[in-house]
Amino acid sequence: MKKRIKELTDLLNRYRYDYYTKDAPSVSDSDYDKLYRELVTLEQSYPEYVLQDSPTQQVGGTILKGFEKYRHQYPLFSLQDAFSREELDAFDKRVKAEFPNATYLAELKIDGLSISLSYENGFLQVGATRGDGNIGENITENIKKIKDIPYQLSEPLTITVRGEAYMSRQSFKAINEARQENGETEFANPRNAAAGTLRQLDTSVVAKRQLATFLYQEASPTARNQQNEVLAELADLGFSVNPYYQLTSSMDEIWDFIKTIEAKRDQLAYDIDGVVIKVNSLAMQEELGFTVKAPRWAIAYKFPAEEKEAEILSVDWTVGRTGVVTPTANLTPVQLAGTTVSRATLHNVDYIAEKDIRIGDTVIVYKAGDIIPAVLNVVMSKRNQQEVMLIPKLCPSCGSELVHFEDEVALRCINPLCPSLIQRSLEHFASRDAMNITGLGPAIVEKLFLAGFVHDVADIYQLTKEDFMQLDGIKEKSADKLLAAIEASKSNSAEKLLFGLGIRHIGSKVSRLILEVYGDISALLTAKEEEIARIDGLGSTIAQSLTQYFEQKTAAILVDELKTAGVNMHYSGQKVNSDAALFGLTVVLTGKLNQLNRNEAKDKLEALGAKVTGSVSKKTDLVIAGSDAGSKLEKAKSLGIRIEDEDWLRQL
């Protein structure tokens, strides 16, 4: 029986590979089902012989308790966006300045969810979401339910690969039809449906919804030299690889490819929202390196957003957590990019004045970044006698006088006791990307605030079961869950807490960069603006905002209250030594190194506090030049930049 189970497992896995990866079925569905049923029967009778890569282990379902956080060994960076031919030409110019003979590979930008798959000796170990690029969620059990993801590779490799999980238009249509029949809310678009599916706790639901994938990157070190070779290897290993791509050195040919794909976009079985252009040489990619947010060797051209006409019925003014007052237009409903849109942002008062937007106007509405509905401009030919919009002088929440600073485009309420400002700050603190206090959403925050139970974020940690029980609609079980979520948030990473404080210009990535240097939020109470500005990726604006916040007496009180409540203040990641020899310096490696390989040299520089970049500019502080150094060395000399060799680096 053991031998037969092995035969069936190997045979069925080969059939799955032919069907899902090669798109060339080598057996009829009925024959496959017959063999599959035989394997199921044998495995039920002899469970001790069930193999790790059995296809039966990738179907069925279990109920998961939740998803654990997963720190990516290789960070997932965002891509720089481009919306015009001019931006692509500028990218081409930057690359060709370093590598005149560079070629590009243009690939489809799948409108799905980024995933990372890690294999050990050929077997799938971890499937994870992108998250913030450094920390995602471990969704391995759900990943196993996606039929075109191989549980075992065709070779016993230890490798980490990247790609997109998506839902086909056909599957999306079928799911929404079923949800409509069951009286359930329909998904807005395939991307939302795929996102909701990957976060399902019931893995059988994932299996039924028939997600699919396209893989496009080997994140771990590879023996391949070119990106097109990587795609070929991924296909050989058993992954699904998108068949549409263009290899060329000409931006004219790239543009022709983009226009060809855009024209057939609606004919594809899945949604795409652009084309990604990558430098094809992996060695050149390594030389070009990364900015804080994105690789310098790739750019994502985004297709123009769909636009529709709608009438502005009224305008609401709302106060955000930093006091910014944002205008939102209420519209006649329109279908836009798969969703019904009845509200759209007007951005700020300067935008309203610039576009001369008035209530009653017919306007062009689009989705900024394919996500946020926004008003593009007014259809002047349809304007009648609309009056100029009245801009509020007083805060719609607290009645305080609004200010419009010269260097800002927004109206701002500067009353620290403004109810809306406080509520938005509390909501932000409890949000998923900040302290992730499950259940503590806007409705409950509002009830707590109006009841007088919370006035700042530290008050959240003083709440009792009796406090929650006094709120309308909160029962004992809900109160217990909320208290448990609050307690659990105390052990969150310190960067989540710093982000949760809602300091202007301090996002989640900036929070991590700051704490890599300072190590503890308490240390920020005495941090100097000039020190913060030296941190790679920050600058004077962020430094000023951070120091202004922590110089307030209320900040010291808040930090003390949070610490007393047991909230984690300490950064658990690897701390950067601000006393390191090269701290704050921007360094470029060029030429051939004799003793160290490039990764070893980069690791050493970063350990010494340096930021390693791929190109020489006026911002470069130091160039480490090996043998056969070319244009980068010459440019460094022309700019008067300090130059050292490999021996100097090794002695540090």
Swiss-Prot record:
GO BP: DNA repair; DNA replication
Binding-site residues for Zn(2+), renumbered to this chain: C395, C398, C413, C418
Catalytically driven reaction(s): NAD(+) + (deoxyribonucleotide)n-3'-hydroxyl + 5'-phospho-(deoxyribonucleotide)m = (deoxyribonucleotide)n+m + AMP + beta-nicotinamide D-nucleotide
Annotated source species: Streptococcus pyogenes serotype M1
Keyword Cell division belongs to the record: no
Pfam families listed in its UniProt record: BRCT (PF00533), DNA_ligase_aden (PF01653), DNA_ligase_OB (PF03120), DNA_ligase_ZBD (PF03119), HHH_2 (PF12826), HHH_5 (PF14520)
Binding locations of NAD(+): D29, S30, D31, Y32, D33, S78, L79, E107, R130, E164, K278, K302
Recorded family membership: Belongs to the NAD-dependent DNA ligase family. LigA subfamily.
Cofactor: Mg(2+); Mn(2+)
Enzyme class: ligase
A GO CC term attached to the entry: cytosol
InterPro entries for the chain: BRCT_dom (IPR001357), BRCT_dom_sf (IPR036420), DisA/LigA_HHH (IPR041663), DNA_ligase (IPR001679), DNA_ligase_AS (IPR018239), DNA_ligase_CS (IPR033136), DNAligase_adenylation (IPR013839), DNAligase_N (IPR013840)
Function according to Swiss-Prot or TrEMBL: DNA ligase that catalyzes the formation of phosphodiester linkages between 5'-phosphoryl and 3'-hydroxyl groups in double-stranded DNA using NAD as a coenzyme and as the energy source for the reaction. It is essential for DNA replication and repair of damaged DNA.
Record domain BRCT: where: 577-652
Superkingdom classification of source: Bacteria
Keywords: DNA damage, DNA repair, DNA replication, Ligase, Magnesium, Manganese, Metal-binding, NAD, Zinc
Xref: PROSITE patterns: BRCT (PS50172), DNA_LIGASE_N1 (PS01055), DNA_LIGASE_N2 (PS01056)
GO MF annotation: an example: metal ion binding
Matches recorded under CDD domains: BRCT_DNA_ligase_like (cd17748), LIGANc (cd00114)
SUPFAM superfamilies cross-referenced by the UniProt entry: BRCT domain, DNA ligase/mRNA capping enzyme, catalytic domain, Nucleic acid-binding proteins, RuvA domain 2-like
EC number of the protein: 6.5.1.2
Active site: K109 (n6-amp-lysine intermediate)
Lineage of producing organism: Bacteria, Bacillati, Bacillota, Bacilli, Lactobacillales
The protein, known as: DNA ligase
Keyword DNA repair among UniProt keywords: yes
